[in-house]
């Protein structure tokens, strides 16, 4: 069964980026090699600070969208609580 991930990386400027991936580690490497999102390309290096696992892509994408509506403070609280 495939796994789908929603993740948050902390960028070099302190900002947070939320994304979706099937392989989180490979995606973080892409971000750090400048091959990820435009947002992270100019804010490298990035550090993985949070991830959630889902069994379907649909669930993961819904959660990614939800997290992207959160304020920075809500994201930081979620990261802190693990």
Swiss-Prot record:
**Gene3D superfamilies membership:** GIY-YIG endonuclease
Q: Which CDD domains match?
A: GIY-YIG_UPF0213
In Pfam terms, one family for this protein is GIY-YIG
Ranges of residues in domain GIY-YIG: 2-77
Query: InterPro entries this protein is in?
Result: GIY-YIG_endonuc (IPR000305), GIY-YIG_endonuc_sf (IPR035901), UPF0213_domain (IPR050190)
Q: Which family does it belong to?
A: Belongs to the UPF0213 family.
Q: What is this protein called?
A: UPF0213 protein SERP0126
Annotated organism of origin = Staphylococcus epidermidis (strain ATCC 35984 / DSM 28319 / BCRC 17069 / CCUG 31568 / BM 3577 / RP62A)
